[in-house]
Amino acid sequence: MPSPDILRTEALRCVWPDGTLALDGVDLSIRAGQVTALLGSNGAGKSSLLLSFNGILKPQSGRVLLLDEPLDYSARGLKALRQKVGIVFQNPDAQLFASSVYEDISFGLCNLGLPEPETRRRIEAAMELVGVSALARKPVHHLSFGQKKRVALAGVLAMEPSVLLLDEPTAGLDPQGADAIMRFIRELQRSRGMTVVVATHDIEMAPLFCDRVCIMERGRVLFEGEISAIVEHRDLVRQAGLRLPRIAHLIEILVSKDGFTLPGNVMTIGAARKVLKTLKENQKSDERR
């Protein structure tokens, strides 16, 4: 059976203070315990949707529901919401402002009124989890961009949320750093059953680390479904200003231009390798006949 929805929007419409329409009637469901990619070009509404999930962006109409309960935008309601739904911004400097790594990670916890031993346990566990324990006393402004990303993530994880929102988590990272942080996030989801929502325009990353996808354009949802359905909806992918994953595009060309008979949902190197090995085995079998 499909996982229950942990977050849901109904006809969500949000407008920025300058009058810019951010979200235009968005209906979307986020499955519990899965990784969902919000895919779209710049200005598609991905970041706005994350901000609405966290209560930062309040709708003009429609609503956001967490576990079937509409969000409460009172001070008390937002405080409770942000313990359950944590967000990591694209630019870590937007949420790092304490003098040291330890102090920055402790900031959110200090407002919860937790006993000091529990606060310390959470901070140390979060630092260990993201690999920044050795940086505990280091000034935040001395960190590399990748280290800042990890510290920002640790600050959110210390709150022990059930939903983790990530805005362009691989932006500004080298390929090795991007791969490492996405592998970490995937393992976090698998080991803890955490729900993760990733806003990105990196369509190569989505098939490797995500279960579901939401394709967005100009504040609207064009498609929502399993990640494997990207290729079936290639027209919507291109309408959104994106392209197919490189491997999927190659398969598309081989089938349409070169007469190959290949499965259409191949999107990763691993999947392509399996297909090619099968073709090779079939060729050998034909030669023996």
Swiss-Prot record:
It is an enzyme of class 7 (translocase). The keyword Lipid metabolism does not apply. ATP binds at G40, S41, N42, G43, A44, G45, K46, S47. Pfam families: ABC_tran. Its EC number is 7.-.-.-. SUPFAM superfamilies: P-loop containing nucleoside triphosphate hydrolases. Its main location: membrane. GO terms for molecular function: ATP binding; ATP hydrolysis activity; ATPase-coupled transmembrane transporter activity. Residues 7-243 form the ABC transporter domain. One of its GO terms (biological process) is cobalt ion transport. Keywords: ATP-binding, Cell inner membrane, Cell membrane, Membrane, Nucleotide-binding, Translocase, Transport. GO terms for cellular component: ATP-binding cassette (ABC) transporter complex. Transmembrane segments: none annotated. PROSITE patterns: ABC_TRANSPORTER_1 (PS00211), ABC_TRANSPORTER_2 (PS50893). It is a peripheral membrane protein. It is found in: Cell inner membrane. Belongs to the ABC transporter superfamily. Probably part of an ABC transporter complex. Responsible for energy coupling to the transport system. This is Putative ABC transporter ATP-binding protein CT0391. It comes from Chlorobaculum tepidum (strain ATCC 49652 / DSM 12025 / NBRC 103806 / TLS).
